[in-house]
Amino acid sequence: MTDIKNIRNFSIIAHIDHGKSTLADRFIQVCGGLSERELKEQVLDSMELERERGITIKAQSVTLHYTARDGETYQLNFIDTPGHVDFSYEVSRSLSACEGALLVVDAAQGVEAQSVANCYTAIEQDLEVLAVLNKIDLPQAEPEMVINEIEEIIGLDAHDACRVSAKTGVGIDDLLEQLVERIPAPEGKRESDLQALIIDSWFDNYMGVISLVRVKEGRLKKGDKILVKSTGQTHVVDSLGIFTPKRTETKLLEAGEVGWVSGSIKDIHGAPVGDTLTLAKTPNVAALPGFKNVKPQVYAGMFPVSADDYEDFRDALAKLTLNDASLFYEPETSDALGFGFRVGFLGMLHMEIIQERLEREYDLDLITTAPTVVYELALVSGDILHVDNPSKLPEGSKIEEFREPIARVNILVPQEFVGNVITLCVERRGAQINMQYLGKQVALTYDIPMAEVVLDFFDRIKSVSRGFASMDYAFERFEATKLVRVDVLINGDKVDALAMICHLDQSAYRGRALCEKMKELVPRQMFDVAIQAAIGSKIIARQTVKALRKNVTAKCYGGDVSRKKKLLQKQKEGKKRMKQVGNVEIPQEAFLAVLKVDD
């Protein structure tokens, strides 16, 4: 077994596309974790979706052995982290298991907002942060400028930052040497009682729940009886080991090491992420401080297309929740869509990914309603209510004031695009808090309503700045504002799944836009279909989908006009009867139309 002073636990922090997964590949190659044949690009992005979108979603871990120049062999436990803003909680989780972090910055692009946010998370957790410049093989790389940026924006001392190219493998050895030298060894006594932190869990159909753990104190071996602190349940360890990136069994895990444990836990919530494991015979070991539970920012209704899939859908959600601690769900029924769940997400990317994972990994067809954020209502009775579903809003007369969540948004953008970004923030009802020039970049801080941020702000900001701006956001507070619920009526019936909450100033416009969009999507019937948008009992917009009609007077050649009138009158009455009993099928696209009502 490796001596504790020769263990190094670290993770890599970087913005999307700054090359952390490729750097991980190089580490694995240099330390001989996989044979040449098994090495595919981005080994750690094991989920199909991750490979397809080229982003890291789940944290992964790898244990490598590296023989340094001083002849010692070090055990490197490397935990990969995602870079996208929606997954920042995954990052804080990975970091809590490490003593150090590599801050990887693209030498051509410079510092970006997510790296700043994640870097502060690392510094708050007292980790040793090493700056690394990646992609120095690119002709447009400007290492000197980027080093200044790191020092100015983040305040890290970066004059001796390692310069590497993960793609070509330049400088990787020096980086590993620096890593071994500067990142501290874990603290912990192997003789004391077991104390281990669960970093991540996932469900395997054969082995039950498998947990990724970081052993802080003591040791864990096969056959041990372990106790999960929060649930109080005990399990016997069936197998444990490390990832090399393949799952490899070992005899024991000791203080300072990171590895996986399986205890044939069949209950999906048997090993919650952030929990502490200890031996059953030492139940009063203190629980480790877990990570803060993340509150979902966006809620949407998800409904299976066919009602028979409801049970499968429920099981699939339960399995995903195990793997993704930030997912929240509760059952919901809708008149238009039947039984389903109200699911909470961290942001729109997270929502898309969960929906794709449900559709791919569990073979489900789902309809998703328009996402909403959580609003706070002060009622006339003095109660405070939190609402995440437009159809659950009480009547207007009962509401004293409406409060919407405000997000503090930090944006880093090159100087030439500042104007566009500011315009966008103002359109989104943002209030400027701060603005400072740092080298070639400008740091903007805005308070923007969460509802405006989560939907497509990220995409919009990328498009107005040609992809150079980067942002990160966090919930700040609730603020009173004028909001209304816009209902959609089809032939006078409310469709609950299409309701949306928006600002009073935008309501007439959004109602009109939605009706126009719906008119294109609702198929023509045998009778006129009226599509209306209403606030309370006041109709603010209307579109009519015209009826299909047969030309009943075609068979009359000449003849008396009263004959034609009679036929037309008869047709009219038929249509009227149809309209009373007919109901309109609303296609799936129409529910998504609510999302696409552009500003």
Swiss-Prot record:
A GO cellular component entry from the record: plasma membrane
SUPFAM superfamilies: EF-G C-terminal domain-like, P-loop containing nucleoside triphosphate hydrolases
Entry annotated with the keyword Ribonucleoprotein: no
Main location: membrane
GO molecular function, one term: guanosine tetraphosphate binding
Reaction catalysed by this enzyme: GTP + H2O = GDP + phosphate + H(+)
InterPro entries: EF-4 (IPR006297), EFG_III/V (IPR035647), EFG_V-like (IPR000640), EFTu-like_2 (IPR004161), G_TR_CS (IPR031157), LepA_C_sf (IPR038363), LepA_CTD (IPR013842), LepA_IV (IPR035654)
Name of the top EC class for this enzyme: hydrolase
Keyword annotations from UniProtKB, A to Z: Cell inner membrane, Cell membrane, GTP-binding, Hydrolase, Membrane, Nucleotide-binding, Protein biosynthesis
CDD domains named in the record: EF4_II, EF4_III, LepA, lepA_C
EC number: 3.6.5.n1
Recorded topology in the membrane: Peripheral membrane protein
Binding site residues for GTP: 17-22, 134-137
Family: Belongs to the TRAFAC class translation factor GTPase superfamily. Classic translation factor GTPase family. LepA subfamily.
Function comment: Required for accurate and efficient protein synthesis under certain stress conditions. May act as a fidelity factor of the translation reaction, by catalyzing a one-codon backward translocation of tRNAs on improperly translocated ribosomes. Back-translocation proceeds from a post-translocation (POST) complex to a pre-translocation (PRE) complex, thus giving elongation factor G a second chance to translocate the tRNAs correctly. Binds to ribosomes in a GTP-dependent manner.
PANTHER family named in the record: TRANSLATION FACTOR GUF1 HOMOLOG, CHLOROPLASTIC, TRANSLATION FACTOR GUF1-RELATED
HAMAP family named among the record's database cross-references: LepA
Protein name, UniProt field: Elongation factor 4
Organism taxonomic ancestry: Bacteria, Pseudomonadati, Pseudomonadota, Gammaproteobacteria, Oceanospirillales
